[in-house]
C-alpha cells in the first residue's frame, strides 16, 4: 500500500522494496582457503563487516529513490498508464539472474574478481547520479511547468536500477570471500540492515526533507516555499559519495587472494544457463513456476495502486512514507514467528491459509480509499485516520509475510542441495516476477476501467438513449479493479490453490535435476 522499507513481495519491493530473498549467499562454498589457520573473531574482521554494510547501504539508495518517484509523479497528476510504464523500473532486481552468471565468470584477475564489476558499476552510478541531478527537474517538469517526461524518467531509472542490481550481484559474491568461514554468516545481516538503511535514506528521509509542508511544520521556525533538500540536491550528494567511496575501495581494499578460483568458475557461464533450463523443464518445477506466476494477481490492485490512490485523495506522500517506519520491528519479528509454522513438511499450507485474508484486505483497502476524502478536514487528516491506515498496513504485512516466508521455506525445502544456490535463485526469481507483472498490469488497467461509460451493458442501451446518451455515474477503475482482482484471487485459491499444496506431496526425486557431467 505505502512504500515499505523492506522489499518483500512488492513492486517497490520490490520491495523490497529488491526482491523476495533471491540471495544464494551462504549456500555456496566460499572458497578453498587455508583452514589450518585459527578462527578469526568478529572483531578482527570488523573493518570488512563495516565495509560490506556500507556497500549495501549504497545499494539501497537507488532502490529508495526509485520507490519515491511514483509518489512524486502521482502528486503531479500523471495517468496510471504512465505509472504502469514507470513500474518497469522495478524489474531489474527480479531479472538479475539473467546476467548474474556473466558477472560471476568475466573479470580481470589482477584487479580482483568482484572489484572488476563493483568499481566500474559504482563509478557509473555516481556519474549517472551527478548528471541526473542536472536534468531531473526538467524531466519532472519542475522548471517549465510541463507534465513529467515519464518515458525519459523510466529509461533513466531503469538503467539506474540495472546498475544497482549489478552492484548487488558483485557485493553478494564478494561477501562470501571478504569474510572468513567463521564470520560469513554476518553477510546476510549486512545485506538486510544495509539495504534497509539505504532504502530508508533514499525514500522515507528524502520524501520528508523534500516536502515543504513537513519541513515547515516540524523542522523550521520560518516557513519556506520548498523543502530542505530537492531531488537534484539529493542525487548530487549521493553521486559524490559514490565516486569518493568507490575510489577508496579501489585503492585501499584488496580481495582475498587465498581463495582459489576453480576451473568451473571460469567456464561456468554456459553451464549455468544450461543448468537453469534443465531445472525449469522439470515437470514439478514448471508447474510450480506457472502457479506462482499467477498466484498474486488477486493482490495486484491493493499492492500497486492503493498508495497512489491515497496520494491522489490528498494524503501527503511523506506521511505515507513515514508510516513504513513503525513497520520495521514488525517486519523483523514476523519472519521469526512465522518460520516456526513453516519449518515442517508442508510449508505451503500457511501460504494457502493466509491468502483469503490478504484478498479480503484488498477490499478493505478499497474502502479505506473511498473513506479518505470524507475524513479530510481543512487540508489535513485526523490522527485516528493515520492509526487506521497503520493498522490496515500492519494486518496486510502479517498476511504478506506469512505467504512470503512459506514460499521461501518451500523453495529451500525442494532445492537440490548439490546446486542449491542456482536452484534457489531461480525459484525466488520466478516468485519475484509473479509479483512484478501483475502490479504493472494493474496500474495499466486503472485508466481504461475509469470512464464515464454509457451503461456499458448492452441490455441498458435503450435506457441510455432515452437519457440522451448522457453519463450518469463516473466509476473509478480502482474500485472495479479491486473487486475483479479479489474475484480472480478467490478463483485461484479455490481451483489452483489445492494444486499448489499438492506439490508438497511430490517426492524428492521430482525436484532433483539430472546433470550431464
Q: Predicted regions: what is each one?
A:
Residues 1-43, 127, 133-154, 166-167, ...:
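Intracellular loop-helix junctions on the cytosolic face of multi-pass helical membrane proteins
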Residues 28-93, 286-313, 320-323:
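Helix-loop boundary and gating motifs at the non-cytosolic
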Residues 80-81, 176-191, 317-318, 386-387, ...:
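Loop-to-transmembrane helix entry/capping segments in MFS-fold secondary transporters
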Residues 89-97, 125, 185-217, 324-328, ...:
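Glycine-rich segments within core transmembrane alpha-helices of 12-TM secondary carriers
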Residues 95-112, 210, 331-356, 372-373, ...:
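Helix-to-loop junctions at the C-terminal end of transmembrane segments
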Residues 111-119, 208-240, 349, 444-488:
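A membrane-interface helix-boundary motif in multi-pass transporters
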Residues 118-146, 356-382:
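C-terminal ends and interior cores of transmembrane alpha-helices
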Residues 162-179, 400-422:
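Intracellular juxtamembrane helix-capping segments at the cytosolic ends
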